[in-house]
Amino acid sequence: MISEVDMDDNFLGLRARDEFYSGKHIHRASQLILLDPENRILLQKRSPGKFWFPNRYTYSVSGTVADESYEACIAREMLEEIGISVPFRRLFKIPCIRENKGAYHTIFSGRCSEEAASLIRHDLEEATSIEWVELEELHRAVKAEPGNYTPALREGIIKIFKEGCEKYLF
């Protein structure tokens, strides 16, 4: 079950995941920007079997919010999707909503040590691959080839660079 919200992100109730595929409901999602000691971001390439944005690159960890807070969701998804847990902080919320469908994406950031990075194992049902990418390189890529990235990742990276990386990531 996934949390349904209104246009102002007020909780309405829980719905089955497949009901959101109709495009008639708004849900919540949590996203993690995971940085390594070299300030590279871990990206995952979404599995071709994913309903939303298959085969596109997205955040290090991405999950829909069930009957839980945004924070509880990202903590749970981190362990499920990459097999590690790191301290994180909330950065901002992005409304990716068009015609009363879509999601509120709350973006978090965390940093892992070299040792923790070596322990990362991605969930093959969620992602076909993961890779570490320089932030500047990602910023250029989301502008040059937007179709390769999820809308929430594009909007988040553009916001971070527009407002200053230091404000959010360091």
Swiss-Prot record:
Its EC number is 3.6.1.76. A motif (Nudix box) lies at residues 59-83. It catalyses: dimethylallyl diphosphate + H2O = dimethylallyl phosphate + phosphate + H(+); isopentenyl diphosphate + H2O = isopentenyl phosphate + phosphate + H(+); (2E,6E)-farnesyl diphosphate + H2O = (2E,6E)-farnesyl phosphate + phosphate + H(+); (2E)-geranyl diphosphate + H2O = (2E)-geranyl phosphate + phosphate + H(+). Residues 25-155 form the Nudix hydrolase domain. Belongs to the Nudix hydrolase family. GO terms for biological process: dimethylallyl diphosphate metabolic process; farnesyl diphosphate catabolic process; geranyl diphosphate metabolic process; isopentenyl diphosphate metabolic process. Keywords: Hydrolase, Magnesium, Metal-binding. This is Prenyl-diphosphate phosphatase. Optimum temperature is 37 degrees Celsius. Stable at 30 degrees Celsius. More than half of its activity is lost after 30 minutes of treatment at 35 degrees Celsius. Activity is lost by 30 minutes of treatment above 40 degrees Celsius. Pathway: Isoprenoid biosynthesis. Optimum pH is 8.5. InterPro entries: NUDIX_hydrolase-like_dom_sf, NUDIX_hydrolase_dom, Prenyl-diphosphate_PPase. GO terms for molecular function: hydrolase activity; metal ion binding. It holds the Pfam family NUDIX. NCBIfam families: Nud_hyd_Meth. Mg(2+) binds at residues 77, 81.
